[in-house]
Each structure stands twice: as structure tokens, then as C-alpha cells.
Amino acid sequence: MFKWLEKNLPKIVMAPAVGLIGWFVYGFVLWTLYISFTNSKILPKYELWGFGQYEKLWASRKWLISVDNLLIFTALFLVFCIVIGIILAIFLDQKIRSEGLLRTIYLYPMALSFIVTGTAWKWILNPTLGIQKMFIDWGFENFTFDWLVNREMAIYTIVIAGVWQSAGFVMALFLAGLRSVEDEIVKAAKIDGAGIFTVYWKILLPMMRPVFFTSFVILVHISIKSYDLIVALTQGGPGISTTMPALYMTQTAFHKSQVGLSAASAMMMFMAVAAVIIPYLYSELRRENAR
């Protein structure tokens, strides 16, 4: 009895957690999938309605705009977070003075919630309170910076706030990767006459492929589920110019009481995340098996 208990103790300890996760996460994913094939309104209906909700979803102008906004946000968010993160990581990798202080400053935004970040940037970008008012008070009376209330430019305010919060996290990943490279590799390159730019561009950064992949997956995941940042910063406006799928999903469910349509949008988001996560997990498993 005691031998059996000792052998199976890890499984016994993990069983409640696995059961709860299976029920409250994957169980509700399956429930949402089922509801997306019904004509549910305020309350769930369990009679199947086929792909009607998905047809209705992709015929919705608001949904199509939210998808376009997501593509724009994700592309810019990825590029700027990775580029800025790499630059900051290389800067700190020079073992400068006050590295600990600078690392804390760069990482501090990541400690904030997106609600706090969105609220802060809403004040900064507000034409009557923030940057525009500051420059006007300095005497630049013709200066305008009204992106927050401009339909064409509002989406870029979300990019600015998102990059400000997440670039430090990417920096931490790349800095850890750079610090894990053996010093002999860098010393050998310098002996061969390689300059600092060549060392990073042709030697160190190509070795950071796993860090690139990890950063890509995490940032795409953050962008797809973006909700609180948008609610705090623009609430999807002006109009619907900054609406994204996560905001569309909640508004459809709780404001319009169309549970089936909301479930369909949730499943589209789930598939988008899965399309990014599954290749990453496959790559990691292959690398583990190759060792």
C-alpha cells in the first residue's frame, strides 16, 4: 500500500488540478464551440443551427473591421516590440553602469495592467490634457496631436501604448539569451577582426532563433486577446475604428445579447491563437526529443 502510494503520489497530488483545469478550461471551450453552432440569444439554446452564426459573423462589417484592426495592430506591435527589445537588450549587454536601474525602468511597464497603461496613455494623448496641450502652452499654438480622436490614427495610439508596455519584456528575453552565449565565441570573433555590429548581426542574433520564436508567440497571443487596453484607451472608438475581436465578442454577448454569435467570434479567436501556439509546441517537443 505504502509503495503504491509513494509511486503514485505525484499523480494523486496533480489529479485535482488537472481535473479542475480540464473542466473549467477545456470543458468550457467545448461548450463554447457547441453554443457557436446554435441560435442562442440571451440564454443558451441547445438545438443545432449549423454554421449560421459563422456566416453571420463574417457578413458583419463590424467584425471585418475588427479583424483588419487586429492585423494592423499585431503587425506593428510585433515589429516595434521586437526591434526595440533587441536594441535595449544589446545596449544593456554592454555591461554599462546602472544596468540594474535601467533594467528595472525598462521592465516596470510590464508590471502594470493594461487597464492602468491604457488610462495613463489616454491622459497623455488626450488633446485637451496631454501632449497637444503641453506644446500649445509652450507657445506652439498650431501644434496638433489628435490621434486619439482621429478615426484614421486612433489604432496607432493602441500600438504606442502596447509597445510601451511589452517592449521591456522582449528586452528581458533577449538579454537573457545574449548572456547565455559563451564568452569564448565573442572573443574569437573579435580576434578575427569582427566589429561589434558584425558580432551581434552575424553571430549572436542568429543564435537567438528560439528567443525570436518565443517572443513572436507571446506577443501574438497578447495582441489577439487585447481587450482591457482598448477599453481603457479608446473603448473601440472613435466609432468602431479601434474595435478588435475581443471587444467585439464581449459587446456582442453582453450588450446585444447574442450569445451564439459571440461564441462564434470566440472560437475564431481560439483558432487564431491555436494556429500560433501549436507550431511552437511542436517545435519545442521536437527539440526536446532531439536531445
Model-derived segments and their meaning:
Residues 2-291:
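A structural signal for multi-pass alpha-helical bundles of membrane permease subunits
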